[in-house]
Amino acid sequence: LDYLVGTRGSIFSAEKTRPDFHEPTGFNIDVCREVRGALPTTPVFLQGSVVDWGQAEWALGDGVCDAVEMTRAQIADPDLVSKLSADAAHTIRPCIRCNQTCQVRDARSPVVTCVGEPTSGRETEDPDWYAHTARARNVLVVGGGIAGLEAARVAAVRGHRVRLVERTHQLGGIAALAGPGAPLVQWLIGGCTAAGVAVEMGTERVAPRPDDVVI
């Protein structure tokens, strides 16, 4: 026996095998502890909603397991491991466990991707979203929901001069009101700040005239 993976659920309770945000993260930690106690010499893998690298590090350090599976976390940010190695954990895009586009049990066999990282799963067919532009333009993004924040962030990372206007006094749109979506909203806001996006809230003013408008 090479190793054991502690899991829950079956074909009759598939929601327990890969649950969304309604279940706690790392919900199989207790299973791994029991397996470790019964088979102390067999390597144990922790699986089940481990999307926070800090929790994974704790589980390894506390002896809960020998390895951790973080599938959805690496769909949300395929560079998770390299960012940790580069001491850039603060730049890791969070998985909010929404299970919207990363489910594998679908007879239609769709691309496994992520609502928070739309390039994930399409690396071989999409152009490089982050290729630096040879000619910077003035870009106006109208709307500070998660789509607007991502558009503004990517445009700024590519070297454009970006201004984002939001009619309300809060960024993130509906996602900011839903508890599970808050970490992604905060990550996007931080990314826009780091990239130099000029954000204006409580306004519908679009002047001066930009070169490009994203609505």
Predicted regions and their residues:
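Phosphate-binding active sites in nucleotide-utilizing proteins
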Residues: 137-215
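Flavin-dependent oxidoreductase catalytic cores
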Residues: 1-142, 146, 150-162, 170
